[in-house]
From Swiss-Prot:
Pfam family, one: EAF
Job description of the protein: Promotes transcriptional elongation by Su(Tpl)/ELL. Essential for development.
Annotated InterPro entries: EAF_fam (IPR027093), Tscrpt_elong_fac_Eaf_N (IPR019194)
Family: Belongs to the EAF family.
Compositional bias annotation for Polar residues: 138-149, 173-192, 271-283
Identification of the protein by name: Ell-associated factor Eaf
PANTHER family referenced in this protein's UniProt entry, alphabetically: ELL-ASSOCIATED FACTOR EAF (PTHR15970:SF2)
Region (Disordered): 138-226, 256-501
GO cellular component annotations of the record: nucleoplasm; super elongation complex
Modified positions (Phosphoserine) in chain numbering: 202
Taxonomic placement: Eukaryota, Metazoa, Ecdysozoa, Arthropoda, Hexapoda
One GO biological process term: transcription elongation by RNA polymerase II
Domain of life of the source: Eukaryota
Localization: Nucleus
Gene name in the database record: Eaf
């Protein structure tokens, strides 16, 4: 039953009837046969443009190397296709040959299995299937039947045996494994290249913790660049304000003597005397000081100190009085330190510029009133000193100093040295008091306290001014004191000393 089924399958495939046929053994089973040999050729793909009217050639070289050349059709544009490969001997594989004319079936042994591949020099892929007389008997395996003296002649009828597939299948697997290994090596190199690119990209994606390294580098390089570029650090307003405050304080602390000497020598060189100007012109001079070194220092000093602290400056700038006058003024300052300290905490950069005109006039009138009271006491002391000096025959030096002080624009520098020393000493003490009374505080927190302290000071200064006006009675209607009265008193003292001589 099994044979019948097999015959039916073969009959269907070969269009053979159901009759029983004889199986003949071919010449290959004869041990003395040296003329007949059957080979199989296996190629990697099936070409389409094969010219079946021409013969193909098989060349077996040394070391089992085989070259197969297949002619192509003229329409393909390529004359032929070349295949190269190796051959292996068969051991148990056979081939059945069916003759349609006679109906005889012959079995033959297979000699070699040839596996070839298309060479890369050719562009198109071609077929290895060769034409023969028994081409219709092909079993679909594409075998080449060669006959000849050496067993490698021209193909006459490709016929496949049932055991051929089982014999060639492992060969095929081995060849494909070799081919696949080669292709895997090539594709493996490509994959390695892709893997090489992936690590380059993957650190970029996964290096978020490692990217902070350049982020940390940039701030380290940025400060050096900012340090070189002073334009980026200078425009910040808080830095400018802080630098100016510290710079002005250092200038006041280090150059107190220079500021005093410069202000004292200003009138000798023709500058305006700050001690003898009115209240309105005194504020105008602060904003419109001449662009000299001494004028700038005086303006910076006046802007640094608050308005209540500036009331000490007219008495300091008012030159032309002896050491007794400066001593009396120093006592006057010691008697009222509490009135000067509260506003001394304000910054002079914006305090004096932000005050109203009415408040400025009130402050200047108060400062001038205090200075006038101090000068009145000093004049009284000077008159008593001049009278006592005339009686003790030592009025020459006092009268000379008074006469020199009365002429402020024409006095020599030699007669002013003792006065300058006393004023320098007093100015240094005032600068130290300012430095001790000016901490680095904000303007916003000081301005309300300054307003309250200013109102308290105004209330305290009103009865004091009334007492001074009642005692002195020599003030002008505009809040200032006339310079003519002071000069007349000084001239009277000098004349009395001359008469005594």
């Amino acid at each position: 039953m099994i044979m019948t089924k097999q015959k039916n399958s073969l009959a269907e495939r070969l269009n053979i009837g159901e009759e029983v046929r004889e199986l003949k053994l071919g010449a290959t089973f004869n041990p003395k046969n040296t003329s007949t040999a059957f080979h199989t050729i296996k190629y990697d793909f099936k070409p389409a443009s094969v010219d079946t009217s021409r013969m193909a050639s098989v060349d077996v070289g040394s070391n089992n190397q085989v070259t197969v050349t297949v002619p192509n059709s003229e329409s393909s544009g390529v004359p032929h296709t070349v295949y190269k490969g190796n051959q292996r001997e068969y051991a148990k594989e056979c081939l059945m040959i069916y003759d349609k004319e006679t109906g005889a079936i012959t079995i033959e042994k297979l000699n070699h299995n040839i596996q070839v591949k298309k060479t890369r020099s050719e562009v198109t892929s071609k077929s290895v299937q060769l034409p023969g007389q028994h081409a219709s008997v092909n079993m679909g395996q594409g075998q080449l039947h060669s006959q000849g003296a050496n067993g490698a002649g021209t193909g006459q009828g490709p016929i496949s045996a049932p055991g051929h597939g089982s014999g060639t299948a492992p060969k095929m697997e081995n060849s494909t494994m070799r081919i696949s290994t080669k292709t895997k090596v090539s594709t493996g190199s490509r994959r390695n290249n892709i893997i090489d690119f992936k690590p380059r990209n993957s650190p970029m994606q996964q290096s978020s913790p490692s990217r902070p390294v350049p982020v940390h580098r940039s701030p380290q390089s940025a400060p050096a660049w900012d340090a070189n570029n002073a334009q980026q650090t200078l425009p910040s307003i808080p830095l400018i304000t802080d630098d100016d405050d510290f710079g002005l304080r250092a200038a006041l602390h280090n150059s107190g003597h220079a500021n005093t000497s410069g202000s004292s020598t200003g009138s000798a060189t023709g500058q305006t005397d700050f001690g003898s100007i009115s209240s309105s012109s005194h504020i105008g001079k602060q904003r419109q000081a001449p662009p000299h070194g001494h004028g700038k220092r005086q303006q910076m000093h006046q802007r640094q100190s608050p308005p209540m602290a500036q009331q000490q400056q007219p008495s300091n700038y008012g030159r032309g009085y002896n050491g007794g006058q400066s001593h009396a003024q120093q006592q006057r300052q010691r008697n009222s330190p509490q009135q000067q300290r509260p506003p001394a905490y304000g910054h002079g950069n914006s305090m004096t510029m932000d005050l109203d005109s009415t408040r400025e006039q009130e402050l200047t009138s108060q400062s001038v009133a205090q200075a006038a009271a101090a000068l009145e006491q000093q004049i009284g002391g000077a008159l008593s000193a001049s009278s006592s000096s005339s009686e003790s025959d030592s009025s020459d030096s006092d009268s000379g100093s008074d006469s020199d002080d009365s002429t402020e624009d024409d006095r020599p520098m030699e007669g002013q040295q003792p006065v300058y020393q006393n004023q320098n000493h007093q100015q240094q003490q005032m600068a130290q008091q300012h430095l001790n009374q000016l901490p680095n505080l904000g303007l916003g927190s000081i301005s309300p306290a300054y307003g309250s302290n200013h109102q308290q000071q105004q209330q305290q200064m009103v009865p004091h001014q009334q007492q001074q006006k009642q005692q002195s009675g020599i003030y002008a209607s505009n809040g200032g004191f006339p310079n003519d009265l002071l000069q007349n008193d000084l001239q009277l003292s000098s004349n009395s000393s001359d008469d005594d001589d």
